[in-house]
Amino acid sequence: MMMRFLSAVVIMSSAMAVGLVSAQRCGSQGGGGTCPALWCCSIWGWCGDSEPYCGRTCENKCWSGERSDHRCGAAVGNPPCGQDRCCSVHGWCGGGNDYCSGSKCQYRCSSSVRGPRVALSGNSTANSIGNVVVTEPLFDQMFSHRKDCPSQGFYSYHSFLVAAESFPAFGTIGDVATRKREVAAFLAHISQATSGERSDVENPHAWGLCHINTTTVTENDFCTSSDWPCAAGKKYSPRGPIQLTHNFNYGLAGQAIGEDLIQNPDLVEKDPIISFKTALWFWMSQHDNKPSCHDIVLNANSAANRIPNKGVIGNIISRAFGHDDFAVRSSSIGFYKRYCDMLGVSYGHDLKYWFDNTPSSEFQRIQMRVAA
């Protein structure tokens, strides 16, 4: 579903080259309002992301509190980096061009930015997604069978929005059409993974989010990596919207969202917020220094002349299960087109290319090899 349809990185105006500024008021001088994710509130009551807003004249959400391990980015909740330090595309805080310039920088950048960052209309990413992209009535229409199929309403709209708050870049980058396409692509992938492959029903693309656990009966415990010692008696089988699989993926996902999923892998099938977070973690995270699905959808790595094609995506998602067949591709594209139609947005360019050349169905049984 990750498609070559999105616009090139927007060239920011000279006024924004040293930091993004919004007309949004905040703090004690701005009526008590708060700034969007990754922005700071100055003592004068305005939101921005440069030194005057986040440094010595900052009132709240300031440049401070860099993690002791110096990690940053969506995989760890987008924590701040210290003053004069930036978050690189590989998820580390640091200074200099390797962290702060152009396509190498993820946020807190010193010169250019990798893509348009949008000041949210409310106080949270969830508020933005809910108000601008997917409303609750529309979500219920998209997944009209989720309450009467095996998942029994487990995947709620509220859980989706709460989980999205931990990944503020999801569905908030670019214009409204771009944001809608990213959400449509994400929802299409998790729908394909959880549909139970209902090809025998009248409208199979209305049956997303129907399963929590894998529908394949197996005794495999998926304890495949010595880097993440498995808990006694636990299985790391496919669970949740993205069908998270293998102990190393449970370990890394849990580390990113602050849950011990090695000791408690069942949380992915019992807590819907955690379940959605694991899917968003996979979507937003870079694996083995490859671009994330989010980046590929946004064509964020175009500056490095890396066309998001089968080769790039294939480096992120392995083909171990061999589900790259026409029927699954057709089902995936069907979900995507249905959601785009419901969101009132075009499909984008080169749709046939993407589904003929991208093993998108591997999202159905996640097997990505990531560094522990």
Curated annotation (Swiss-Prot):
Residues 1-23 form the signal peptide. PROSITE patterns: CHIT_BIND_I_1 (PS00026), CHIT_BIND_I_2 (PS50941), CHITINASE_19_1 (PS00773), CHITINASE_19_2 (PS00774). InterPro entries: Chitin-bd_1 (IPR001002), Chitin-binding_1_CS (IPR018371), Endochitinase-like_sf (IPR036861), Glyco_hydro_19 (IPR016283), Glyco_hydro_19_cat (IPR000726), Lysozyme-like_dom_sf (IPR023346). It holds the Pfam family Glyco_hydro_19. Residues 24-64, 69-111 form the Chitin-binding type-1 domain. GO terms for molecular function: carbohydrate binding; chitin binding; endochitinase activity; metal ion binding. Glycans are attached at N123. Zn(2+) 1 binds at H70. Proteolytically processed to yield a very small protein (8.5 kDa, 86 AA) containing only the two chitin-binding domains. It comes from the Eukaryota. Zn(2+) 2 binds at H90. GO terms for biological process: cell wall macromolecule catabolic process; chitin catabolic process; defense response to fungus; killing of cells of another organism; polysaccharide catabolic process. It is an enzyme of class 3 (hydrolase). It catalyses: Random endo-hydrolysis of N-acetyl-beta-D-glucosaminide (1->4)-beta-linkages in chitin and chitodextrins. Rhizomes and inflorescence with immature seeds. Its EC number is 3.2.1.14. Functions both as a chitinase and as a N-acetyl-D-glucosamine binding lectin. Inhibits the growth of several phytopathogenic chitin-containing fungi. Also possesses insecticidal activity and superantigenic properties. This is Lectin/endochitinase 1. It comes from Urtica dioica. The gene is UDA1.
